[in-house]
Amino acid sequence: MNGDNASSAADRAGGPAATPVPIPIGWQRCVREGAVYYISPSGTELSSLEQTRSYLLSDGTCKCGLECPLNVPKVFNFDPLAPVTPGGAGVGPASEEDMTKLCNHRRKAVAMATLYRSMETTCSHSSPGEGASPQMFHTVSPGPPSVRPPCRAPPTTPLNGGPGSIPQDPPSVPQAFPPLTGPAGLFPPPRLPDPVPSAGSSSPCFLPRGNAPSPAPPPPPAISLNAPSYNWGASLRSNLVPSDLGSPPAPHASSSPPSDSPLFHCSDALTSPPLPPSNNPPGPPGPPGPATQPPVSSATMHLPLVLGSLGGAPAVEGPGAPPFLASSLLSAAAKAQLPPPSTLQGRRPRAQAPSAAHASPRPSQRRPRRPPTVLRLLEGGGPQTPRRTRPRAPAPVPQPFPLPEPSQPILPSVLSLLGLPTPGPSHSDGSFNLLGSDAHLPPPPALSSGSPPQPRHPIQPSLPGTTSGSLSSVPGAPAPPAASKAPVVPSPVLQSPSDGLGMGAGPACPLPPLAGGEAFPFPSPEQGLALSGAGFPGMLGALPLPLSLGQPPPSPFLSHSLFGVLAGGGQPPPEPLLPPPGGPGPPSAPGEPEGPSLLVASLLSPPPSDLLPPPSAPPSNLLASFLPLLALGPTAGDGEGSAEGAGGPNGEPFSGLGDLPPLLFPPLSAPPTLIALNSALLAASLDPPSGTPPQPCVLSAPQPGPPTSSVTTATTDPGASSLGKAPSNSGRPQLLSPLLSASLLGDLSSLASSPGALPSLLQPPGPLLSSQLGLQLLPGGGAPPALSEASSPLACLLQSLQIPPEQPDAPCLPPESPASALEPEPARPPLSALAPPHASPDPPVPELLTGRGSGKRGRRGGGGLRGINGETRPGRGRKPGSRREPGRLALKWGTRGGFNGQMERSPRRTHHWQHNGELAEGGAEPKDPPLPGTHSEDLKVPPGIVRKSRRGRRRKYNPARNSSSSRQDVTLEPSPTTRAAVPLPPRARPGRPAKNKRRKLAP
């Protein structure tokens, strides 16, 4: 430690050479035919001390892992009979006692040793049952460090060659699978089996990585995992899901999706969830196989990874803790170095292989069922439906609707949400997972929160609904760990409530979680971003179920199928819509609540795919399809509204409208989906709406009138018809308004900022007028019009939805005062501010111009705004006085006038400049009173010049100075005495140049 060779050797070997010889970290020691070979991290073989010395003394050779004071004979023992201890310099407490005395080299070696040790311990804990655990550990340790793996690989072939190890692993994987199959061995083995890598034919490395990731996740849940520890987790994910999802969370889906589509991801996740009910007890026996996948899925989540892989999260977590305990240095270094290689290499290739492997096992059979996972996604809002146990039920449900394609999987989920028998299990599963078993599901939420967004994003591309489902199912496995991350999951929870509603079994439980606050949290920014690609991020987050349902691929199908289901399932009465979990049995009750959500989702979700690309057409179709649902009966709309808690004018239809809390967390009366949406929307829209938070009548939104303007019209008329009140009359946003406006607008605002498609939607609806709802998401001047009482907030919302119809806003607003509302939007500065993307630039300019032009003095105060340019102004202000200061402001504006409107100011400036000169004459306030006359003459003569020169100075410093000097000279000629005063006004305006000239002229 102190640089003493003996001490260092003792640290390494723990004693003289006779004692076990430590192998430096990253180095390998092989005995072949009685000869000892040391393999350096770079792969060089050293067979003797002389060769070793030569190697170490050579430049450009790899000396990683060697302690700083290196005693070659003690470190490199070529006695084939000498006992060997792996570990090297970093092994033993002595090596870590005096880190302050270690040189950088040794510190690195110790850090690496610590990192390896932590990885190995993690692997050992997580995969105690696997025979290959030693290799696993080695693999893991090498896996994270890009360089070391090769070094260790030689000793462990699997490690050495990722592919090679995989082949070897495959056998072990099968074993792992059997163990997984066995409920008892399911969880611990699963990690090694997490070898889902095995399915993916990933090598033990993956398994260890899976283990490692799980440990890593606990310490730095999201970040840590992502970093070094996550390297393994990432590799695991890559093995499981990465290819499809492309994000850590994908692991669940990836396990099966690599081979299959996102739908399959869902199915895989479902399959694994049922098998794993990794959530621990849920389905230990059944879930073994799935458990493996779920673990991987959980790996996706970082923490969830640990939970999922363990199936028994605790086991994984325990191991996980050690890795992080290892050392912040190691973790940091590992994160910086290891994550890229293991994540990049392991994730995609391995993800594909594992997914195939997983898919090939039971997952392949249940994949059809996975589609119900989509329901979970819808219910849980994506990542949340991680319940693997329940996923089993959903899996069966999908069977009735074995829709391989995204839309079809969504349909089954939708059907289940609607209350179809098939969805029943999935719903109960999803609702229970998402809502009902928040305690149980917390881990899933964590998954969803941690990595679900990413999974969602990847999933959405292939099958939004399915993707969500797969993610949800994946989170389920890691649910236990997710609990800590539950907050992130909240949005999933909300979504799950909707699902639960469809189920009807888990609403009560789910609702409490929602009440917890996590349930209602909108999707995390990550989730929103991930979802934004497919649809409105806010919409997705706010409307967990609808969003997942309305994901672009399935949205058209879903909307129609949902509508058909709703229509066929019987027009859901308002009550059915609200019916709590109690009504899950009757498809109509669950369906109806789902119906409104689905309708909303279809409206919003199609926008992601249809509306975003062709905003005008999709809305009409969606609305048209939506209208039937609305037509189903105002009761249905009312029921939804009540679920939303927005009775609005029609308080009666909304049983729960009275209480926002009930709306937000309706235990059973309102569908979970509605509750989730309503809670978020109501929270967002109820406050802004000022008194009529209810007005969320999504159903009422559709108007029998024109489908294109159906959004707006729907807002106005449908609200009245369905709710029995005129949303437009009340001016409050009806159910749709709160749901769509709060979630939609909020999401739209986020989309407007990020997604290109959404902006298109938002821009047209400048009239979204979130302002009514208290939402600032209005892109352009939409808010003011909507704000006008004439146009109901709902109309604004619908307009925003109608954005595609281009100018449906006017039609929508007309009922109330569309023209006026629309006009105000562009004109209103707040709107412009709210919706800078659309109209803000134009209106703001006029306002600024008018405001600035109207009061230049005010601008003085505002001069601070132009303080940048105004540095010179202060000087001017000194000489010119208050009047000149305004002039300076004007000049500055003139400088800016280029952009905003110099024309107006230029004349004013002229006046000001002349004025300044005149003031000098008459007021002489700024300068010498006696000289004002001459000044006025002089100034009058050069005022134009002065203006130009000053402008020139600002534009071009040197030319301006020259011109100013010439002016000064000219003005000075008439009266040298006046020079000081005359030059001063122009000089004051220019600033320093004037000062310099003054100095020159004064003498």
From Swiss-Prot:
Record field: compositional bias (Low complexity): 252-262, 351-363, 410-428, 462-500, 533-550, 591-604, 768-798, 818-837
Compositionally biased intervals (Gly residues): 636-650
Keyword Nucleus: yes
Cross-referenced SUPFAM superfamilies: DNA-binding domain
Compositionally skewed regions (Pro residues) per UniProt: 142-157, 168-196, 273-293, 393-409, 441-458, 571-590, 605-618, 805-817
GO MF annotation list: chromatin binding
Biased segments, Basic residues type: 947-958, 989-1003
Cellular compartments per GO CC: chromosome; nucleus
Tissue expression from the record: Expressed at highest levels in adult testis.
Subcellular location field: Nucleus; Chromosome
Keywords: Chromosome, Nucleus, Ubl conjugation pathway
Domain of life the protein comes from: Eukaryota
Residue spans of biased composition, Polar residues class: 708-719, 960-969
Keyword Cell wall biogenesis/degradation applies: no
Region (Required for interaction with ASXL1/2/3) residue spans: 59-70
Region (Disordered): 123-222, 241-302, 334-619, 631-659, 684-736, 753-1003
Domain MBD: 13-83
Comment on protein domains: Possesses a methyl-binding domain (MBD) that is necessary for chromocentric localization. The MBD may lack methyl-binding activity.
Functional note: Non-catalytic component of the polycomb repressive deubiquitinase (PR-DUB) complex, a complex that specifically mediates deubiquitination of histone H2A monoubiquitinated at 'Lys-120' (H2AK119ub1). Important for stability of PR-DUB components and stimulating its ubiquitinase activity. As part of the PR-DUB complex, associates with chromatin enriched in histone marks H3K4me1, H3K4me3, and H3K27Ac, but not in H3K27me3. MBD5 and MBD6 containing complexes associate with distinct chromatin regions enriched in genes involved in different pathways.
Subunit note: Core component of the polycomb repressive deubiquitinase (PR-DUB) complex, at least composed of BAP1, one of ASXL1, ASXL2 or (probably) ASXL3, and one of MBD5 or MBD6. Distinct combinations of ASXL and MBD proteins may preferentially bind specific histone modification marks. The PR-DUB core associates with a number of accessory proteins, including FOXK1, FOXK2, KDM1B, HCFC1 and OGT; KDM1B specifically associates with ASXL2 PR-DUB complexes.
Additional facts recorded: Named 'methyl-CpG-binding domain protein' for homology to other methyl-CpG-binding domain proteins and the presence of an MBD domain, MBD5 and MBD6 may have evolutionarily lost the ability to bind methylated DNA and are recruited to heterochromatin by alternative signals.
Protein name as it appears in the record: Methyl-CpG-binding domain protein 6
